[in-house]
């Protein structure tokens, strides 16, 4: 995080602190109006998700990469490489310091159970969200996969169209994508 925060055009934002007192880190870059959020390791045992995030950060901060330059010009990108530093440090597989599965807290996060999600949601409320990717991993699946938003009451047809479009693009662009 410190190395990336020192890159030109990257801002470090401390979103808050965890129950163990660790920083909830966010890296922000880009100058566009489209608000893009990438976040990983709500489940700390999914270390591959952070590896993916490291690759995404490396790509997005590469001044020689024309796609990254275009994205930074069109978007404001917010990256939380590790949503659950307490769980990561403690060696937990799915929970934070008090045993909360952060992935289940988004509807009603609290400072006592899920300050990590609360801090991220507060920042999302400030910036807005046009695209969000919650990066997970499964050591038993040797491919990239995405899961949709089935069952979310506020889901719109426009969001569904965007999701389907993204899935088609991902399928065309990477042989590692599992459909």
Predicted regions and their residues:
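Non-catalytic propeptide/linker segments at domain boundaries
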Residues: 1-11
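Active-site/substrate-binding loop(s) of hydrolase catalytic cores
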Residues: 9-25, 31-176
């Amino acid at each position: 995080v410190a190395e990336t925060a020192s890159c030109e055009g990257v801002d470090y934002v401390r979103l808050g602190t965890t129950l163990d007192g660790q920083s909830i880190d966010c890296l922000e870059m880009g100058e566009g109006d489209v608000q893009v959020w990438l976040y990983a390791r709500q489940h700390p045992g999914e270390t591959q998700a952070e590896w993916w995030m490291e690759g995404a950060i490396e790509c997005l901060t590469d001044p020689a990469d024309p796609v990254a330059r275009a994205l930074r010009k069109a978007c404001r990108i917010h990256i939380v490489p590790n949503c659950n530093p307490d769980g990561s440090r403690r060696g937990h597989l799915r929970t934070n310091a008090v045993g909360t599965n952060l992935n289940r807290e988004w509807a009603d996060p609290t400072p006592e159970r899920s300050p990590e999600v609360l801090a991220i949601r507060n920042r999302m409320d400030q910036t807005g969200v046009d695209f969000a990717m919650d990066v997970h991993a499964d050591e038993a699946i040797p491919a990239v996969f995405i899961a949709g938003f089935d069952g979310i009451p506020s889901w719109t047809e426009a969001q569904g169209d965007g999701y389907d479009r993204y899935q088609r693009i991902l399928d065309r662009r990477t042989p590692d994508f599992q459909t």
